[in-house]
Amino acid sequence: DCESGPCCRDCKFLKEGTVCRIARGDNKHDYCNGKTCDCPSNPHKGKHH
C-alpha cells in the first residue's frame, strides 16, 4: 500500500486513529487516517475556545 512515512509500517497503512505526531503545547495529537502514509494535520490545531 505504501513505501514510507509516519503512517506506514511494513508497506501497509497504519490503522485510522494511530497517533503519528505527538501534541506540543496547546495543539492536539495528529492521527493517521488509514488512507495515506503521510501524517495529516489536525484541523483543530492551534484553535482556542
Curated annotation (Swiss-Prot):
Endpoints of the signal sequence: none
Report disulfide bridges, numbered on this chain.
C2-C11, C7-C32, C8-C37, C20-C39
The alphabetical list of record keywords is:
Cell adhesion impairing toxin, Disulfide bond, Hemostasis impairing toxin, Platelet aggregation inhibiting toxin, Secreted, Toxin
Can you say where in the cell this protein is located?
Answer: Secreted
The answer to whether the entry has keyword Mitochondrion is no
Tissue distribution of the protein: Expressed by the venom gland.
Q: Where are the transmembrane segments?
A: none
Which coarse location class describes where this protein primarily resides? Answer: secreted
Outline the extent of the Disintegrin domain.
1-47
As a miscellaneous remark, the entry gives:
The disintegrin belongs to the short disintegrin subfamily.
The free-text function statement in the UniProt record for this protein reads: Inhibits ADP-induced human platelet aggregation.
Q: What is this protein called?
A: Disintegrin leucogastin-B
User: Which species does this protein come from?
Assistant: Echis leucogaster
